[in-house]
């Protein structure tokens, strides 16, 4: 999994930061998958500065309906049609996302030429394709808001081909059955159990992408043990009370949660426009004083999960 930050500013864009949008690249030689988390104004323009084609998007997850996370969506949907894209797209979001999209398309005389599914979600598991699952957790914010936990399913361990050959099992279709954990019978009557020749399963990666939030009950469960946690750090420690009063978090709160949840890495984003580059480094230092494995997301930053 690969994260590409298209927008990292809170509320309004700045000269160097657009409003919130994050790509999750799941593409692999044997599988497709390009997901977008939030779609603030100008997101499709930010996409033009990357190597990713909007036509490859197959899922969009909206955390909540505040404009800095949403207002880029109608334009992106229409541009996909104007480009002749026919790949289906599914949008997940809180109650009201369907009305927003359908109203924006209707009153602007727009449409989509590709299958578009809109799923209004609640807390709980919202998606599982057998490779990975996505679970939504309620955030603490003035509007209904969700954070998303993305978990890969464990992958089967490697098959010990050498041991199988030594046992007289010929390479070929039988190996595929054994890799699936099945038991086969050889021509000489021996039974071979695939589980005996498989290494331990490879744990899947886990990622938590928080929506806008102040401290909340679901935060620890959402973030527990993930490899990477993406969390807002809208304001610094000195302005924590102001951040919380508006349903946001401070640097201290983001870093303390990362430490308590035992995450591998914290990436902070959704930075107030009051902070210039020097101010952003101040935010990063505050987080690292509590949780050293912290990175600051800038627009177009790329992180591997």
Curated annotation (Swiss-Prot):
UniProt-listed CDD domains: RNaseZ_ZiPD-like_MBL-fold
Gene: rbn
A GO term, aspect molecular function: exonuclease activity
Residues annotated as the enzyme's active site: 68 (proton acceptor)
Chain residues that bind Zn(2+) 1: 64, 66, 141, 212
UniProt feature coiled coil, ranges: none
Record's keyword annotation contains Nucleotide-binding: no
Membrane-spanning parts: none
E.C. numbers: 3.1.-.-
UniProt protein name: Ribonuclease BN
UniProt keyword tRNA processing, yes or no: yes
Enzyme class: hydrolase
List of residues binding Zn(2+) 2: 68-69, 212, 270
SUPFAM superfamilies noted in UniProt: Metallo-hydrolase/oxidoreductase
Cofactor comment text: Binds 2 Zn(2+) ions.
Entry keyword set: Endonuclease, Exonuclease, Hydrolase, Metal-binding, Nuclease, tRNA processing, Zinc
UniProt xrefs under PANTHER family: ZINC PHOSPHODIESTERASE ELAC PROTEIN 1
Annotated InterPro entries: Metallo-B-lactamas, RibonucZ/Hydroxyglut_hydro, Rnase_BN, RNase_Z/BN
